[in-house]
Amino acid sequence: MNILIANDDGVFAPGIQALADALKPLGRVVVVAPESERSGFSSALTLDRPLRPIQIAEDVWAVNGTPADCVYLSMNGLFDFEFDLVVSGINRGANLGDDVLYSGTVGAAFEGRLMKQPAIAVSLAGPDVRSYDHKDDYAQAAKWVHDFITKGLPALPPRHIFNINIPDVPQLKGTQITYQGRRAQSKPITSHVDPRGRQVYWIGLAGEAVTDPQRIASQIQSDFFAVANGFVSVTPIQMDATNYAVLEDLQASLG
């Protein structure tokens, strides 16, 4: 099996290194990732300048582009073989609820799925994760991904991926299939004056989770709920954002 690994934290991030080490027993693992952090780039592609892939080690490449660029290049001519699976991560921080709209980790996985291959996005969720700088900090999460793939990925419809969030806890309680939760409105921007007297702003402080159960038949909980209670969250998400439930009503009202 040929496995492509990408991320949005950059090619030298400890999460992607741990993931590559864990998956090597499953086949050939190729890492193609941004040369520096590209968090929040979603599925963006670079169209205004050339991309420059540089091989920095055996089966490890750095690209001066976005996470989706890395996957697009890898599956459209950078290599003379095809990949069987795309894994994006392990992200340094959660991608829960509305986070998936912005996530470069998720964007890279979606790009792989657009190329007709199974794809999963993996994130490590916890308050201390941003300070982790060694691949051993991601070892438990990486092993979970290895075991998940080894068991055989459940089949998903076209244009769907798995968004997986693994809580940063000493002992995982198990795995839950979840729906995508949502956050409250993002926290306000913060502003200050820089040393040159210019007003500058910071954005990106995520809002808290909203308790908003979806109307589904079973007792499936949100991704937020699973992670908060020590479970790995596995959420099937799709590219098609059409609201089919209101299509006919909307057509009737505008027709």
Curated annotation (Swiss-Prot):
Cofactor(s) needed: a divalent metal cation
Swiss-Prot/TrEMBL catalytic activity: a ribonucleoside 5'-phosphate + H2O = a ribonucleoside + phosphate
A Pfam short name: SurE
GO MF: 3'-nucleotidase activity; 5'-nucleotidase activity; exopolyphosphatase activity; metal ion binding; nucleotide binding
Keyword Transmembrane belongs to the record: no
Domain of life where this protein originates: Bacteria
Binding, a divalent metal cation: D8, D9, S39, N91
Main location: cytoplasm
Location within or outside the cell: Cytoplasm
UniProt key word Glycoprotein: no
Enzyme's top EC category: hydrolase
Cofactor note: Binds 1 divalent metal cation per subunit.
Coiled-coil region: none
Keywords for this protein: Cytoplasm, Hydrolase, Metal-binding, Nucleotide-binding
GO cellular component: cytoplasm
EC number: 3.1.3.5
HAMAP family per record: SurE (MF_00060)
Family that this chain belongs to: Belongs to the SurE nucleotidase family.
Function: Nucleotidase that shows phosphatase activity on nucleoside 5'-monophosphates.
Protein's UniProt name: 5'-nucleotidase SurE
Lineage of origin: Bacteria, Pseudomonadati, Pseudomonadota, Gammaproteobacteria, Moraxellales
Gene transcribed to yield this protein: surE
